[in-house]
From Swiss-Prot:
Forms part of the large latent transforming growth factor beta precursor complex; removal is essential for activation of complex. Interacts with LTBP1 and TGFB1. Interacts with EFEMP2; this interaction promotes fibrillar deposition of EFEMP2. It is found in: Secreted, Extracellular space, Extracellular matrix. Contains hydroxylated asparagine residues. Belongs to the LTBP family. This is Latent-transforming growth factor beta-binding protein 4.
């Protein structure tokens, strides 16, 4: 999956750098290409290509690699996206030197197609033997010395400027990562050629051997290109072969090479600047450059290195964004060259001559290897297990070139690996790219970035790796030179005839072969021979050329990671010319004449019987006598070059002398160099002694030999002995040292303290001197102080303090003290340390008759104010409240300064403006009180209202209010009292009249007023408001309609109040009161109540249920496959074919009593519950190896098909003493009581460890089972957990029946069902399976996050729970929610339906087209209801199932306790690889498609803990991996348990097949949109089954109505059921209550005198109030 990048995919752009055609036919199709001046330097071959890669891509071997997509090649004449590939210009070497030529090339910046590029390539074919170009950018300004800039990697368009490695500074009209987007309002620029800029590129040829003077060949090119195009060339390698000028076959081969998708045989090692989010300077890794010319860095080494590793190796500069020269290079560059010029690299000038530098003596080179000095350089010798890297300056571990491939995981969670990339790669690529977090099938963690483990496998730093082809060239022996190739003629005596120059035997260097298998290379076209006059023999295989000393190094050709060989550029047409190696028949002279080179390096001598060879010096005749072979002089004993190293050469040998030796007069000997005779001598300050190959420095006392042994260096005694000078400082001297003592110490080692107190005069003056170590301390008297240790006592100037100690005075300092001089009005204190004020007011005569007020330094006189009087010379306040009652009797006096204040009582107030007594307020004069129905009367402190008749004073007494006589008195009996303003009136009914007082209604006695004539012969009986004519009946009877006397039912006529708290029973002519019993109880003869046992009649609940008597009631517990009827007194069959939609798939569903069957229409097909289709019958047991006997299919547990054999041949199981015998198998061995955790006592090692066992042994001597990732486990259990290998047949496997092997130990308190592989443990309702304890444990429903008892208190019980409510709340019908009996049902009201609830429980998106009831909203449309945002129950909860009458997703079990259903709760029986799915509040995995669209509910109900773990199901398949139990094993669909086989749906609007989930919508959409895919007319005309769901059936469709609705077949809609009318009279729905029908349900309203009980729809007599 390609990660979306900024700006989308890169557009295709081809940038071609083509040499200009010299012929007339070389016109360019591109519009006005810019000319480029190119300097062509002969005698060298080279080519160049520069790749510019898109963002998040890096160039690698002329390929742009993106971590998020597949590798895209960057071959010649191709460019993709923001990549820019400059097409290389091939060239051919010149056979002879000629002056530099200049020509023109065209740089075409127009986007071209591949066909246009190929046509342009044909027209711009390079002509001439010396055409080639090198590019290198010249920066616009010179960088400071010692700091070179790495070019900015981004290509900024539309005039943008690259300011950071990942940022472009755009002009105002453009935006985007690369300034490629037009801002709002900006118009796109007109298409035009962008401005051109010129860059100059100058670089040496890489992999080119310097000549004997050490000067590299340099080339320069001037290039004009747009400003947004950036060219970065770090290194240029030579072209492998030349081109011929006018050879059609060579042009054809070049065209074929241009069409190839692989890279050319020359490469440009280009690298882009790193991204800031990948690594930074702080990471310590950067680029290492091997060349530094001026302020520019060039020739970077592949990979990343630290600055230390780079600078101590071959690097000259290092950096990430800026490259900094190494310190050692700066020192060398700053040295002044001698008179003879600079020395070549690796040499230094000593006494006017260049001497080899021993790089190994400086240390820090050849990391992980041993440094060996060579002339002009050094080499690294790597130990076993290490290889030379591509820079040949350090050794890297062989672990970095491991080619083992495995999955690379990008996510780690809870110790598991997930989200692997789409292909298997090596561990180095996975971890060094920092894309992967773990690698391999065993989930091996990648080492942390920057750790030692990371540096071991990623020595090149992050983002780079080594391949085997990169290092294969460096694994040759140390003394072996790179392969060389010569184009010169082999040496032969001058007299021997030579073939023509064009016929010289030559061979193009071939790339090194790859060890792995490779396809056959393309056949190379035979070169066209030049015309000649005499016939030529048939060409034969060309011999291997002999290396020559002066030959050029053979360029290395590294194969690509793929097995396809690199395409080659053609060679010039040179006919092959070789001689035969086998003598031919004929005269010998003709043989020597026909083939003068038949002897090789010798002369052919004809003989009568053939010929022989006269070999050149250094060669001898071969074993067959027909060819001269080289003599290896180095194999002679003794060796000819001791003590040097002998190197054999064709026809001779040479001696390579080691360090400390030099070649003697003869080339075959090495003489010792006497280093001691050098001027100046090498041993500074010492004596030099020469040794073979080296020298030794004898140093005097105080000196020691330097680490390199070439001089004597001073011994730093101060560093060797840190405590040499004690408290002093050790100062090193040449050959010695001295101690510098601090103040207060003396002696040679500063060990003697100086007693300063003994000196004269004493150092402390007036103080006491105390000597201390190295100093002294002064104890000063008062008025003196010391500034610290070693300081004398000095006088303290108290007058300089702030504030001054002499306030109001002048301070004068004295020796050790001070004195104060006070002004007038002040006097010094007793101590004389400060000035005190003189209080003149102490003299009473100072202010006669006035108050004296003292002030600092003076005083003043003033008279007393009002309310004050003079007391003892002071003005004091007069307390008016203490004399009399100034506020009167109704006020409280409060004294104030100079006056007083009166606080008056309510109804009183003080006079305004001045203090005075409180007077009464006349409210009748100030307010409109008591009006209009009363009169105001003032009282002392208040007032009263005298109201008119029919009125009374109000609550506050300020007004008169009307009296409602009708509500306060029992007026107008038998009439209606109507209140009037100030009175009332009685409205009497017919038959009544008002009384004399007009306050009551009296009955009119018609019998008395109208006399006996009113009823004739019958008796007139007056009644309230009327009368009647009746016969005379006995008491307790009344006349009937036919003139009879009928019994009066006093209990019905007078109600329950006739008997109070007892129950009324009617009797003939009377009634009686008996004690009351609740429903379900019956009275006893003694007056008590006892329970009625409804289950005494065993057929009370019918044939499919068991009657369970309860106190005051009963319960019918239905059998499996049945559900309770509406009346609760019998059970009816569940039609699974209707409730489980599409349960049989393509088969026909047939409902049977208590279950159902899936019948296939075509015989003899069988129904497969896993696929939901009818399939041909399976093969009988025993047909295939390892198959098990097939159990007959049953509705309870569908049989699973036998697992096929694994796809690969497994290794044999581990044999040995460990697996022999039978012992005990243990589980949970980490527990403290592991010895008691025994699964079985007589099992084998394989049976225990290949199942759920963790240890095996006897007597608690437990041997741990091997880990699943170990080789021992793979050998013991080759087919994985749950399978054993039958004896004698390693290719077969046998499933282990854990339920039979471990009996009840593996599924305690549950039902164990064997599966293949593994087993399933079915726990009772209210229990869940504990995977570690291997048993069913009770689930604490009260501890779940969702409240089990809504509005009440939850009490957990074993296997269940019950809810209690606080009065006046009662339990509803579900027994799981507390409701108020007086509250109105939610479904009686219509409200707004909210379609979405946010994470903060805020309702949004209301349904605006209609309002809905609570049930309609939650079941059909939304997530919350009403203005209070009442949340709907979760769709995977029991409440939702009960509310909406829906079948939950099959991945969940049946309803929890509290209703009718199956007595076992089943979790999803998910087999591998879907077992052990992690879930929780922070991590919900995607649903197990196609079964469950919702995250698992909280608590352990949602799933069964599988005994065998497996990787998470969301991991994509690997290219070469199967599942954990074989590729052909698929997970079983979830099972609903006994009688409920299930398959994934394949109909529209239902559960799609796994492969159809992405095309037909998710399972969530199938549940939330049940009408999707159905036509409108298929579900009727009323919006498709209102109050129900549209269900497909084989005959078409039908409506499945919700509870409380029934199907009206005429309208195909669900109509409300009136439960109140359809209830049977003998079994009413509401007991002691009135039934009220609602939409889809009903509710009960208790009758007067009755209250609701804990039983639903039951009301009991209310208790009388005390």
């Amino acid at each position: 999956m390609r990660r979306p990048g900024l700006g989308g995919p890169c557009p295709l752009l081809l940038l071609l750098l083509l040499p200009a055609a010299t012929s007339a036919s070389g016109s360019s199709p591109s519009p006005s290409p810019s000319p480029i001046e190119k300097a062509v330097v002969p005698s060298h071959q080279a080519g160049v290509a520069a790749c510019h890669c898109c963002l998040d891509q890096t160039p690698k071997s002329s390929r742009c690699t993106r971590a998020s997509c597949r590798v895209r090649n960057c071959p010649p004449a191709k460019c993709t996206g923001l990549e820019g590939c400059l097409t290389p210009t091939p060239s051919v070497p010149s056979p002879s030197r000629s002056p530099v030529e200049k020509s023109q090339v065209s740089l075409n910046w127009q986007p071209l197609t591949l066909q246009e590029a190929r046509a342009l390539l044909r027209q711009r074919r390079p002509r001439g033997p010396w055409a080639r170009a090198l590019l290198k950018r010249r920066p616009p300004h010179r960088a400071p010395a010692g700091q070179a800039r790495v070019l900015c990697p981004l290509i900024c368009h539309n005039g943008g400027v690259c300011v950071k490695p990942d940022r472009c500074l755009c002009p105002p009209d453009f935006a985007g990562k690369f300034c490629q987007l037009h801002s709002s309002g900006a118009r796109p620029p007109a298409p035009a050629m962008p401005g051109l800029t010129r860059s100059v590129y100058t670089m040496p040829l890489a992999n080119h051997r310097d000549d004997e003077h050490g000067v590299a060949s340099m080339v320069s090119v001037h290039v004009e290109h747009p400003q947004e195009a950036s060219v970065v060339v770090h290194q240029v390698e030579r072209v492998s072969g030349p081109w011929e000028e006018a050879n059609p076959e060579a042009l054809a081969r070049a065209e074929a090479a241009a069409r190839a998708e692989a890279a050319a045989p020359y490469t440009v090692l280009a690298q882009s600047a790193p991204r800031e989010d990948g690594y930074s300077d702080a990471s310590g890794f950067g680029y290492c450059f091997r060349e530094l010319r001026g302020s520019e860095c060039a020739s970077p080494l592949p990979g990343l290195r630290t600055q230390e590793v780079c600078c101590r190796g071959e690097g000259l500069a290092w950096g990430v964004h800026d490259c900094h020269p190494c310190a050692e290079h700066l020192r060398n560059s700053n040295q002044v060259s001698g008179p003879n010029g600079p020395c070549p690299p690796g040499f230094e000038r000593v006494n006017g001559s260049c001497v080899d530098v021993d790089e190994c003596a400086t240390g820090g080179r050849c990391q992980h290897g041993e440094c060996a000095n060579t002339r002009g350089g050094y080499t690294c010798v790597c130990p076993d297990g290490f290889l030379l890297d591509s820079s040949r300056s350090s050794c890297i571990s062989q672990h970095v070139i491991s080619e083992a491939k495995g999955p690379c995981y990008r996510v780690l969670h809870d110790g598991g690996c997930s989200l692997p990339i789409l292909r298997n790669i090596t561990k180095q690529i996975c971890c060094c790219s920092r894309v992967g977090k773990a690698w391999g099938r065993g989930c091996q963690l990648c080492p942390p970035y920057g750790s030692e483990g990371f540096r071991e496998i990623c020595p090149a730093g992050p983002g780079y790796h080594y391949s085997a082809s990169d290092l294969r060239y460096n694994t040759r022996p140390l003394n072996q030179d790179p392969p060389r190739v010569t184009f010169n003629q082999p040496r032969v005596p001058p007299a021997t005839p030579r073939p023509p120059t064009g016929f010289l035997p030559t061979r193009r260097p071939e790339p090194r072969p790859d060890p792995g298998p490779q396809p056959e290379p393309r056949p190379r076209p035979e070169p066209r021979p030049r015309p000649e006059s005499r016939p030529r023999p048939e060409p034969r295989p060309r011999p291997e050329p002999r290396p020559q000393p002066e030959s050029q190094p053979r360029p290395e050709s590294r194969p690509r990671p793929e097995s396809q060989p690199w395409p080659e550029f053609p060679l010039p047409s040179i006919p092959a010319w070789t001689g035969p190696e086998i003598p031919e028949s004929g005269p010998s002279s003709s043989m020597c004449q026909r083939n003068p080179q038949v002897c090789g390096p010798g002369r052919c001598v004809p003989r009568p019987s053939g010929y022989t060879c006269a070999c050149d010096p250094g060669f001898r005749l071969g074993p067959q006598g027909t060819r001269c072979i080289d003599i290896d002089e180095c194999r002679r004993v003794p060796t000819p070059c001791a003590p040097g190293r002998c190197e054999n050469t064709p026809g001779s040998f040479r001696c390579v002398c080691g360090t400390g030796f030099q070649a003697g007069p003869r080339a075959t000997e090495c003489l010792d160099v006497d280093e001691c005779r050098r001027v100046p001598p090498p041993c500074d300050r010492g004596r030099c002694e020469n040794t073979p190959g080296s020298f030794l420095c004898v140093c005097p006392a105080g000196y020691q030999a330097a680490p390199h042994g070439a001089s004597c260096q001073d011994v730093d005694e101060c560093t060797q002995s840190p405590g040499l000078c004690g408290r002093g400082v050790c100062e090193n001297l040449p050959g010695s040292f001295r101690c510098v003592c601090p103040a207060g110490f003396r002696g040679s080692a500063c060990e003697e303290d100086v007693d300063e107190c003994a000196q004269q005069p004493p150092p402390c003056g007036p103080g006491r001197c105390d000597n201390t170590a190295g100093s002294f301390h002064c104890a000063c008297p008062a008025g003196f102080r010391s500034r610290g240790p070693g300081a004398p006592c000095q006088d303290v100037d108290e007058c300089s303090r702030s504030p001054s100690p002499c306030a109001y005075g002048r301070c004068e300092n004295t020796e050790g003290s001070f004195k104060c001089v006070c002004p007038t009005g002040f006097q010094p204190n007793a101590a004389g340390s400060e000035c005190e004020d003189v209080d003149e007011c102490e003299n009473r005569l100072a202010c006669p008759g006035q108050e004296c007020v003292n002030s600092p330094g003076s005083f003043q006189c003033r008279a007393c104010p009002v309310g004050h009087h003079l007391h003892r010379g002071r003005c004091t306040d007069v307390d008016e409240c203490s004399s009399g009652t100034p506020c009167g009797l109704h006020g409280q006096c409060t004294n104030t300064k100079g006056s007083f204040h009166c606080s008056c009582s309510t109804g009183y107030r003080a006079p305004s403006g001045q203090p005075g007594p409180c007077a009464d307020i006349n409210e009748c004069l100030e307010g409109d009180f008591c009006f209009p129905h009363g009169e105001c009367l003032n009282t002392d402190g208040s007032f009263t209202c005298t109201c008119a008749p029919g009125y009374r004073p109000g609550p506050r007494g300020a007004s008169c209010l009307d009296v409602d006589e009708c509500s306060e008195e029992d007026l107008c009996q038998s009439g209606i009292c109507t209140n009037t303003d100030g009175s009332f009136e009685c409205i009497c009914p017919p038959g009544h009249r008002a009384g004399p007082d007009l306050a009551s209604c009296l009955d009119i006695d018609e019998c008395r007023e109208r006399g006996p004539a009113l009823c004739g012969s019958q008796r007139c009986e007056n009644s309230p408001g009327s009368y009647r004519c009746v016969r005379d009946c006995d008491p307790g009877y009344h006349p009937g309609p036919e003139g009879t006397c009928d019994d009066i039912d006093e209990c019905r006529e007078y109600g329950s109040a006739i008997c109070g708290a007892q129950r009324c029973e009617n009797t003939p002519g009377s009634y009686r009161c008996t004690p009351a019993c609740d429903p379900g109880y019956q009275p006893t003869p003694g007056g008590g109540c006892q329970d009625v046992d409804e289950c005494r009649n065993r057929s009370f609940c019918g044939a499919h249920a068991m009657c369970q008597n309860l106190p005051g009631s009963f319960q019918c517990v239905c059998d499996q496959g049945y559900e309770g009827a509406r009346d609760g007194r019998h059970c009816v069959d569940v039609n699974e074919c209707e409730t489980l939609q599409g349960v049989c798939g393509s088969a026909l569903c047939e409902n049977v009593e208590g279950s159902f069957l899936c019948v296939c229409p075509n015989s003899p097909e069988e129904f497969d519950p896993m696929t939901g289709r009818c399939v041909p019958p399976r093969a009988p047991a025993g047909t295939f190896p390892g198959s098990q006997p097939q159990a007959p299919a049953s509705p309870s547990l569908p049989a699973r098909p036998p697992a096929p054999p694994p796809p690969r041949r497994p290794s044999p199981p581990r044999q040995g003493p460990v697996s022999s015998g039978r012992r005990e198998c243990y589980f949970d061995t980490a527990a403290p009581d592991a010895c008691d955790n025994i699964l079985a006592r007589n099992v084998t090692w394989q049976e225990c460890c290949c199942t759920v066992g963790e240890g095996w042994g006897s007597g608690c001597r437990i041997q741990q089972c091997p880990g699943t990732e170990t080789a021992e486990y793979q050998s013991l259990c080759p087919h994985g957990r749950g399978y054993l290998v039958p004896s004698g047949d390693l290719s077969a496997r046998r499933d282990v029946d854990e339920c039979q092997l471990f009996q009840d130990q593996v599924c305690k308190s549950g039902v164990c069902v064997n599966t293949a592989p593994g087993y399933s443990c079915y726990c009772s309702n209210g229990f869940y399976y504990h995977a570690h304890r291997l048993e069913c444990v009770d689930n604490d429903e009260c501890a779940d996050e969702e409240p089990a008892c809504e509005g009440g208190r939850c009490v957990n019980t074993v296997g269940s729970y019950h809810c209690t409510c606080e009065p006046p709340l009662v339990l509803d019908g579900s027994r799981r929610r507390c409701v108020s009996n007086e509250s109105q049902s939610l479904d009686d009201n219509l409200g707004v339906c909210w379609q979405e609830v946010g994470p903060d429980l805020v309702c949004s998106r209301p349904r605006l087209d209609r309002q809905a009831t609570y049930t309609e909203c939650c079941c059909l449309y939304g997530e919350a209801w009403g203005m209070d945002c009442a949340l709907c129950p979760a769709q995977d909860s029991d409440d939702f199932e009960a509310l909406c009458n829906v079948l939950r997703p099959p991945a969940y079990g049946p309803p929890r306790p509290g209703g009718f259903g199956i007595p076992y709760e089943y979790g999803p029986d998910i087999g591998p690889p879907y077992q052990s799915l992690p879930y929780g509040p922070d991590l919900y995995p995607p649903p197990v498609l196609p079964y469950d669209p919702y995250p698992p509910p909280p608590g352990p109900f949602a799933r069964r803990e599988a005994p065998y773990g497996a990787p998470p199901f969301d991991m994509p398949d690997f290219e070469d991996d199967g599942g954990p139990y074989g590729e052909s094993e698929t997970p079983d669909p979830p099972s609903r348990g006994t009688g409920w086989p299930y398959r994934s749906r394949d109909t529209r609007g239902s559960f799609p097949e796994p492969e159809e989930s992405s095309e037909r919508g998710s399972y969530t959409g199938a549940l939330s949109e049940p009408y999707e895919g159905l036509e409108a007319e298929e579900c009727g005309i009323l919006d498709g089954c209102p109050h129900g769901r549209c269900v497909r059936v084989p005959e078409g469709f039908t409506c499945d109505c919700f509870d409380g609705y029934r199907l009206d077949i005429t309208r195909m809609s669900c109509v409300d059921v009136n439960e109140c009318d359809e209830a049977e009279a003998t079994s009413p729905l509401c007991v002691n209550a009135r039934c009220v029908n609602t939409d889809g349900s009903f509710r009960c309203i208790c009758r007067p005198g009755f209250a609701p009980t804990h039983q639903p729809h039951h009301c009991a007599p209310a208790r009388p109030r005390a």
